[in-house]
From Swiss-Prot:
It comes from Burkholderia lata (strain ATCC 17760 / DSM 23089 / LMG 22485 / NCIMB 9086 / R18194 / 383). Homodimer. UreD, UreF and UreG form a complex that acts as a GTP-hydrolysis-dependent molecular chaperone, activating the urease apoprotein by helping to assemble the nickel containing metallocenter of UreC. The UreE protein probably delivers the nickel. This is Urease accessory protein UreG. Gene3D superfamilies: P-loop containing nucleotide triphosphate hydrolases. CDD domains: UreG.
Length: 215
């Protein structure tokens, strides 16, 4: 991992909960990442999660069935339109969802907000998210990092998922890493195989350090 430098500050209960936005194309592994983060962090932090789908609450259902968090701590939002609108241009539906969840769980440390699947131009409004994690997958081809777009170049952390599929799709992980560094500069990235939990600890370490959750 191209990791961020540790912070000497620490988030306390006097500060609002950390809001972590998770975006990326359909099928890249956003929901899987959210599930793994919740399961790994729920014993140390008070967590709630909000998922976005266009016409259903399928991701909410998947997280509930997987036991990521208690059902009442997962809220599904039906955006009814273009996914990026609900997290950027008009984030009101998600801001309202955050307010509702925090009214139920005022001691929450982290609010995870998963966007609906979208293209490389999707970004979170700073009103909605303090940290943004953007997930792409190797199956999309090794060229994805060099295509750019705000998700690739501006997210706080880029996750390159499904590294185990690289031999099957002819993707060179070294090329993807090199292109990622060219496109992102000093911004960190992590390569993951979420199904095998590979790289999850690096994502958690990033959230804790960048989100001022640890010394």
């Amino acid at each position: 991992m191209n990791a961020p430098a540790p912070s000497s500050a620490r988030r306390t209960k006097k500060l609002p909960p950390l809001r972590v936005g998770i975006g990326g194309p359909v099928g890249s592994g956003k929901t899987t990442l959210l599930e793994m983060l919740c399961k790994a962090m729920r014993d140390r932090y008070d967590l709630v999660a909000i998922t976005n789908d266009i016409y259903t609450k399928e991701d909410q259902r998947l997280l509930t069935v997987a036991g990521a968090l208690p059902e009442e701590r997962i809220m599904g939002v039906e955006t009814g339109g273009c996914p990026h609108t609900a997290i950027r241009e008009d984030a009101s539906i998600n801001l309202e969802a955050v307010d509702r969840m925090l009214s139920r769980f005022p001691d929450a440390d982290i609010v995870f907000i998963e966007s609906g699947g979208d293209n490389l131009a999707a970004t979170f409004s700073p009103e909605l998210s303090d940290l943004t994690i953007y997930v792409i997958d190797v199956a999309g081809g090794e060229k994805i990092p060099r295509k750019g777009g705000p998700g690739i170049t501006k997210s706080d952390l880029l996750v390159i998922n499904k590294t185990d599929l690289a031999p099957l799709v002819g993707a060179n992980l070294d090329v993807m890493a090199s292109d990622t560094k060219k496109m992102r500069g000093e911004r960190p990235y992590v390569m993951t195989n979420l199904k095998a939990l590979e790289g999850v600890a690096d994502v958690i370490a990033f959230i804790e350090k960048k989100g001022l959750l640890t010394v």
